[in-house]
Amino acid sequence: MKKIVLKLDLHDDRAKQKALKTVSTLPGIDSIAMDMKEKKLTVIGTVDPVNVVSKLRKYWPMTDIVLVGPAKEPEKEKKEEPKKEGGGEPPKKEGEAPKEEGKKEGEAPKKEEEKKEGGDKKEGEKKDQPQAQPQPVVPPPDHVLELVKAYKAYNPHLTTYYYAQSIEENPNACVIC
């Protein structure tokens, strides 16, 4: 699920309805919302943002992507609540002083275990490195991208040329009544 925010140059409700209808034809859309004051269209779903923009640029060449992100924003309130419940240090008891001393004594064995685990991790990382070497994708140069955008925005209406026959040259045009 993605949340896509697009900026459109719409002027009236008719253009708004046309934009909503155009976007709604794409598969994978859960909800569509339009903010006419800010001229922003919000699309939520699994649809590809590039497809949405290319579909809208046929009618509105100045369509731009403002934001592409997750559909639901992370909830900060839930994260803050556990901190408040366990907030602060627990009350000190008489039995805690020996535990802290025990921790100091037990730190040396933990460091040795970490070194052993660290050695295993390094070996694991060495094994993972040859497998995880994706080939870098080279993006096209910016000037080519601008030309492609200009070409897609230019959508001329094709006119059909008809041959106009002369009546004088057509033998079937002569009729005797």
Curated annotation (Swiss-Prot):
Belongs to the HIPP family. Probable heavy-metal-binding protein. Residues 70-143 are annotated as: Disordered. This is Heavy metal-associated isoprenylated plant protein 39. Residues 72-129 have a biased composition (Basic and acidic residues). Residues 1-68 form the HMA domain. It comes from the Eukaryota. PROSITE patterns: HMA_2. Residues 175-177 form a propeptide. GO terms for molecular function: metal ion binding.
